Amino acid sequence: MKSKKKGKNLWRDHYTDKAQKAGFPARSVFKLEEMQKRWKILRPGQKVLDLGCAPGSWLKYASQIVGDSGRVIGLDLKPMDQPDKPNAQFIQGDAFELTQEFLDEIGRDFDVVLSDMAPNTTGIKNVDALKSAALCESALAAAVTVLKPGGSFVCKIFQGEGFDAFIKDVKKYFTKHKIFKPESTRKQSREIYVVGWSKKGGSHVRT
């Protein structure tokens, strides 16, 4: 038992230390980096929306990829310091309250929407999976609303109840999709990422 715990701690320390050395607040950056290396989801000059962006690793990484000609906006209910890059902005608020005033502020012309959000977990697998799926459905609705036709969507979800229904919804709005588990994710973790490409024309907000 001790050796297993030690192994888990070493795994956690490796990615945490690696992130800190690279100047990122959380090791989640390596999950996005893996997807970026594989598919080039982010490109210079793009406009990107990062839902639930705190503590800011994905926001910072995306801003580095899109460069000075691009723009990244991060949204989260939790407070966070403004990014130190001029092409990145943090807005504190509910990412799912897409009022007309808010849409006028951020626009409807995003190339990519990212969501690394996770629900507050209970430890009950089915309950946590359903909570994750509900969060992802809300993220998908936001993405479909603000993405340009042809845009891309990246979302973390827990495997389990609600997963298949979410994939069906992704297929409705995106021409192609992939399901991916990064190497930097714990093997025993049920979290997985869904990537949707080439958003179909039109928009729809779920109520």
From Swiss-Prot:
Record key words, sorted: Cytoplasm, Methyltransferase, rRNA processing, S-adenosyl-L-methionine, Transferase
Alphabetized GO MF terms: rRNA (uridine-2'-O-)-methyltransferase activity
InterPro entries recorded: RNA_methyltr_RlmE, RNA_MeTrfase_FtsJ_dom, rRNA-MeTfrase_E, SAM-dependent_MTases_sf
Enzyme Commission code: 2.1.1.166
List of residues binding S-adenosyl-L-methionine: G56, W58, D76, D94, D116
Active-site residues, record numbering mapped to chain: K156 (proton acceptor)
Name of this chain's protein: Ribosomal RNA large subunit methyltransferase E
Source organism of this protein record: Desulfatibacillum aliphaticivorans
Lineage, top ranks: Bacteria, Pseudomonadati, Thermodesulfobacteriota, Desulfobacteria, Desulfobacterales
